[in-house]
Design a protein with these regions (language model features):
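N-terminal ligand-binding/catalytic initiation module
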Residues: 1-158
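Glycine-rich phosphate/diphosphate-binding loop of Rossmann-like nucleotide-binding domains
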Residues: 77, 82-102, 160, 165-198
């Protein structure tokens, strides 16, 4: 009974708030002077500077503190050929975690594409907006193809939750095990088998 009540409560919580995330301004517009700094004519100068130095977008815009959390919904809690929309609650929840625990603005992006190269092309087209990409819940083997292509073709960091996250967990477990047995990494041999997908 508790599980059903908890599930209902989780759904009602999301309904009450129309999802978990939203966009809000960092600056209050109280008068025309501030409006002219934020929008016309002030915005033109920021655009000009970025057109001459694209990396300045990391300091003049929110780009340096944003990550795109991207999925195609293909590996979502065992749901067969999951719809991308079904992943939105998960990505919103992860966005809340990014903001709460790291102060990073994360945006959920659910792609309605299954072809790995189309996914790569779409994500690469989005990179001017974000400071990093986080791939999440994309089924193997497509997830490997997508991560590999993005790591080679993107000019911003790419993190695959299932691949890199699994590796971090295994390394953490190994380092803690070494502490327990009182050994150093260079004193042991380790064999890790598997494709690296959680």
């Amino acid at each position: 009974m508790y599980l059903i009540e908890q599930q209902d409560e989780a759904l009602n919580y999301r309904r009450r708030h129309s999802g978990l995330i939203g966009v809000s301004s960092k600056v209050p517009i109280r008068d025309r002077a501030v409006l002219s700094l934020v929008y016309t004519p002030g915005v033109a100068e920021a655009c000009r500077v970025i057109s001459e130095d694209p990396l300045s977008s990391f300091e003049l815009t929110s780009r340096g503190n944003t990550v795109a959390i991207v999925t195609d919904g293909s590996d979502l809690f065992g749901l067969a050929a999951g719809l991308p929309e079904a992943a939105l609650p998960l990505l919103e929840a992860k966005s809340v975690l990014f903001k709460t625990f790291a102060g990073i603005d994360a945006f959920p992006i659910c792609l309605d594409q299954r072809d790995p190269l189309s996914v790569v092309e779409t994500i690469l087209a989005l990179t001017p907006t974000f400071g990093a990409i986080c791939l999440d819940h994309i089924s193997a083997p497509h997830s490997f193809t997508i991560a590999d292509h993005l790591e080679k073709g993107s000019n911003i960091p790419v993190f695959s939750n299932q691949h890199h996250g699994s590796a971090i967990l295994v390394l953490g477990a190994l380092m803690n095990a070494l502490k327990v047995v009182g050994k150093q990494l260079n004193e042991i041999r380790v064999v890790i088998g598997g494709a690296g997908v959680a």
